Structure formats: structure tokens, C-alpha cells
Amino acid sequence: MEEFKGYLQKGGFKQQHFLYPLLFQEYIYALAHDQGLNVNASTFTEPPEISGYHNKYSSLLVKRLIKRIYQQNRFIYSVTNSKQNRFVGHNNHFYSQMISEGFSSVVEIPFSPRLVSSLKKKKEIPKYQNLRSIHSLFPFLEDKFTHLTYVSDILIPYPVHLEILVQILQCWIQDVPTLHLLRLLFHEYHNGNNSITPNKSTYGFSKDNPRLYRFLYNSYVVECESIFLFLRKSSSYLRSRSFGPLLERTQFYGKMKHIGVTCCNDFHKSLCLFKDPFMHYVRYQGKSIMASKGTDFLMKKWKSYFVNLWQYRFHFWSEPSRIHINQFPHFSFYFLGYLSSVPINLSYAKSQMLENSFLIETFTQKFETMISIIPMIGSLAKAKFCNLSGNPISKPAWADLSDSDIIDRFGRIYRNLSHYYSGSSKKQTLYRIKYILRLSCARTLARKHKSTVRAFLQRLGSEFFEEFFMEEEKVLSLILARTSYSSHQLSREPVWYLDIVRINDLVNHLDL
């Protein structure tokens, strides 16, 4: 592991020919499957025609696999049946999948906190990992969005030409053989489809090697955001403060004054269209939200920037309708499974001066997060917990499990959902979800025991509902014992947790 240290230094991973030699190291493939460096890798085994290496990953084996992939006479395509549109002969799909696993491990080396912690001989997870909670975004939105005017709902487009992806990686990977190998891996999964789109070919690519797919997609998104960040920093002349000549303290204020006079006299009319110190941007997966306190014209300018960026930098046309510009408080947007809005609340206060009395109107804005019941029911229906009308149904696939396992699965699903949606300002939808999952569990158990739901619930009694008791209710009961808040007041307050590192699968359907 010591030889990785040179690659983890700043700029060390940009050296030429560091990737391709690492593909021939046995421990790379052990790391790919979290195996010990001296333990046989059991996740994949070699085909019979190349056995005899004790099922270990060796440099000789990898060389033979890459050689077979490069041989053009092994590439046989089917032009009549798309389901057979893959490599055939000598198990080439296995070879390329194995190589792609090693490739994924190599490119993740500079970004792997697990590897960095192991190099430092520390077993604990770095502390900054605790700051990666999904819920940590919402306190930021609560603090910033109440003062903003416009919001843009942006869907980052998927179609990216394969060669563009290679060029993006080429900015920091200067290893030509590795880039050629990456092209071969692309063409195996796509076979003539030169774009990453949410279709069957991409589904096969992401399913067979999700680590490599996530890395490539994140590289593309980082490239988009880096250009956006450059435009954002260049949108205001105040960024000139960071230039080298202005670092001299003796001339700093004089030059700042000169810059201010020059911009006000000569360039003020043009720069005022781009300067926006109140621009805020958040993103999760392929959806991003950009909010501003500027004008509608400024938001349209940014929309034009994004469309031109995707068209001229990544060479594909994106519909302008993928960017929706709306104005608070008349707009609600979906983000991370929540329906968020900034409504205006009116409050009246009666004031009296001498013999005259009058009402004073006060306008306040508050960031609210709610659960939309219709998309949530659709997500539960897709998972076969209810129908599209929201009526609970049994889960036949779980009928063969034991009673305790069935109850535990349903209870765990609800506890995860209630934990994730603890930030909702209105908890009524959680009660509806609780009803659907609880009755679906009862129908599944009744189906297993060939009984009616009513008879089965009477036999179980109140113990059946203990698995669906909210963990948040236990926490809130402890808080109520020490505070003066009522249960009704506290139930409306959002609770954000800093231990949620991934979005729930049922919630994730809402953002698709």
C-alpha cells in the first residue's frame, strides 16, 4: 500500500502512465471486491479455459484478458437481435467486466477516504464524513431561500457522447492505453449507441458495473459545475480583488478605488446585468436548484448560459424546457423527495392610538417542506404495497418468510421513511403511509395463514403495531417532558438528522 502514497499527493495522479500499470497488480482486484490482499478472490472466478491460477488475479491473467479484448476477431455483433448485441465467444463479457472492476478501483484511488485512512493507519472513518448528510442541505435552504426571489429547477441532461466522456477524463488521465481500454469498455455495453441515455443499453452498463458508471457520470457533472463556477466567479468585477497585483497592501486600496471608478463610469450598464451576489446553487444526482435575488432577465441569462454550455461544450442539444424559471412564493419544487416552497404568511395586529384603532399587516416568509401524497402513493404502488388508488394490498413475494421477518421488514421500511421525512412541516402524509404499510403487512400475514385480515388482527392484538411505532415519537416524547411545547406545536417543526447519507429507494422514485 505504500506505493499508493505518491499517487495520492496533490497532482500526483496526473502523472502519465500511472493507471495502466496498476491494472496488472493483483491487489487492485482484491480492493475492487473488498478482499484481503493475500486472500483468494471469490467474487469472480476464472473461466475453465484459463484456469490453473488458483482462482487468483495475477498480472499474467490480466494481460491475457486485455489481449483477448483487443483482438478484433473476437468482437462479433448481432445486427438483428438487440438482446444479443454483446460480445460473444470466449466469454469476453466476463473479461471486460473483470477489467472494468479493476479500472473502477484505480480511478477511485485519489478520491477514496477509505484508502486514505488506511494509509494513515487509522481504523476510524474521517470526521468530515459525518457532514455528508442529505438533510444538511435543508437548513441551508431554510436560511437562504426565504430572502430570494427567483428559482430555477434544472434537470441536468443525460445524453453525453462517449468521446466527450473520454475527453473529460483526459484532462487528468494522460495515459493513452487506459483511454483506449475505456473506449473498448464503452463499446461493449453500447454497441453503436454513442450516448449515455436512460435506456436499455445504459441500464445494462450501470447494472453490470455501477461503480464505473457512477464515476463517469460524476465526472461529467463535475465538468458542468466547474464551468458554471467559472462563470459565477467571472460574473462580478469584484473578483478582481484576488488578482496578483492587488495583493500588495500599499497599493491595494488605491487600485480598488480605481477599479470601482472605471466600472461605474465605463462598464456599469453591461456588468450590472451579470453581477449577482445572491446566487445559490444546490444539486443532488441529476437535479439542481439555482435561486437568486436578481431579476427575471438575469435568470434567463443564466438559462441561456446552461443551454449554450451543453450545446457547444458537450456537443448535444438540450431542450430549454429542462430549465424552469419561477418566482417565489408562487412556486413549489421537488427536491430530495420533498415538496418545498416559500409561502407568504399574513399576520394581523390591532393597534390603537388615542381614540383611533387600526390593523397592521405583517408579511413573513418561511421555508416549508412537505410530502406530496400522490407521488408517494405511486412509489408505494410501484413497490407493490398498494394499488394506484392507495388501497393496501398484500405482498405475495414475502409470504414465504416467517411472521417475525415479515413484520420486521414492513416496520423497518416505515421507520426509515418516517426518519427521512422527519423534516416535513406537515406530518399527515406520514400517517397515511403508516396506514398503507401496516394494512399491507396484515394482508400479507393473512394471505400466508389463509385467514381474513380482521380475524388475524384480533388474534395479534396491539403487539402487532409496536413495529410501526415511530422512533421520532419516542424522541419527541422526551423533548416534551423537558419543554413547554405542546405535541401539536412540536409536530409541525421540522427535524433534520445528520446521519442520513443516502436517499431511500422509495423516496428516490419521486425525483425521477
UniProtKB/Swiss-Prot annotation:
This protein's UniProt keywords: Chloroplast, mRNA processing, Plastid, RNA-binding, tRNA processing
One of the GO BP terms on file: RNA splicing
Xref: InterPro entries: Domain_X, Maturase_MatK, Maturase_MatK_N
One cellular component (GO) term of this entry: chloroplast
Residues forming coiled coils: none
Family that this chain belongs to: Belongs to the intron maturase 2 family. MatK subfamily.
Protein name, entry field: Maturase K
Task performed by this protein: Usually encoded in the trnK tRNA gene intron. Probably assists in splicing its own and other chloroplast group II introns.
Domain of life: Eukaryota
Location(s), subcellular: Plastid, Chloroplast
MF term (GO), any: RNA binding
Keyword Transferase among UniProt keywords: no
Source species: Lemna aequinoctialis
Any Pfam family hit: MatK_N
PANTHER family: MATURASE K
